[in-house]
Amino acid sequence: MYTGMARWDHLTWQEIGERLTRGAIAVLPVGSVEQHGPHLPVATDVLIPVGLADRVAGALGADDLGARLVMLPPFYYTYAKHSNWWPGTLNLD
C-alpha cells in the first residue's frame, strides 16, 4: 500500500543518509507563489507539481524506483513582475 513519497524536510539527517546510500532519487517541485484571482490560493502553481509528483510516486508504488523517490522542499520563487500588484506574490527581481 502506497503511503506517500518521503519528504526531504520531514526526514532526519540519519534517514537522509540511509536513503542516499540506497540511491535516493530527488524530485524537485517547481512553481510560483502569485495571485490567481480571489478563488484560488497563491500557492496554486506549487501545489499542482507537489500533487503530481506524489501521484507519480503512487503510480510507481513500492517497487525499487518508487521507494527511492524523495521529494525536496518545493522551489517557490519565480520572476513574476506582472503579479507584483497583488499581495502575496513572491517575486525574484
Where are the regions a protein language model picked out?
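N-terminal catalytic or cofactor-binding beta/alpha core of small enzyme domains
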Residues: 2-93
